[in-house]
């Protein structure tokens, strides 16, 4: 079963919804709901945590829930799929990647989002929860090369890279003739465009559109749920993804599954792993 909040506005499908309402009352209601669900979350062979903050609760609340789930199930697996303490710390201190959300070369990025995430994860309650879970979980699964690079040095025996899965449908019908206009699609994450580098890619696309208005159709969307994002993307020739990524993530993988070209991360390391 999938117990999730749908990753907020992305609204991914799930079996049990644990979205949080706003405010302290929302936190109390969510905590009560989770404690009511805990007896149903026993006896499983594997429990996988998508992130150290696996519910929308403060880290100090999640310690006890993690211990309960670990005690009453066989194996636990921590997912390295995005923002967490290892990603923030390693990319800010050791800097094994040529570029990331936190560094360009050996220089720390000082944009607002990077500063906020470092402050949020390094030496904090949620950071300590991440360290505990990484140490006590039976395995760690990472979905991108970048995240594997941050966990593997600390846990070489139990860190495994498993690429993101995509459900393959029928082969897309791709026209052979060159279109008169290129249909270019770019999705902007709310409040994270500078952090992910999509602001730079958008400016580049807008300049091409300005210089060659008869050669390019540019569609820009913001904050769409995943299913709507995929529907809106259909019919595009190419999508522009994150600038600071070594590896295609879920959106470009889904795009390529439908025959849409991805302009984004594709560094040699992501293929060599």
PLM ranges: what are they?
Residues 38-61, 75-79:
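Short N-terminal targeting/anchoring amphipathic segment
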Residues 160-196, 202:
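Conserved donor-binding/catalytic core segment of Leloir-type glycosyltransferases
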Residues 261-265:
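Short hydrophobic beta-strand element within catalytic cores of glycosyltransferases
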Residues 12-20, 78-123, 191, 267, ...:
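Acceptor-binding helix/loop patch of EC 2.4 sugar-transfer enzymes
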Residues 41, 64-71, 75, 101-140:
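Membrane-proximal helix-turn-helix segments that form the acceptor-binding/catalytic region
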Residues 230, 252-257, 271-272:
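Short alpha-helical segment that forms part of, or immediately flanks, the ligand-binding pocket
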Residues 87-88, 118-159, 203:
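A short, active-site helix/loop in glycosyltransferases that binds the activated sugar's phosphate group
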Residues 244:
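Aromatic "clamp/platform" in nucleotide-sugar-dependent glycosyltransferases that forms part
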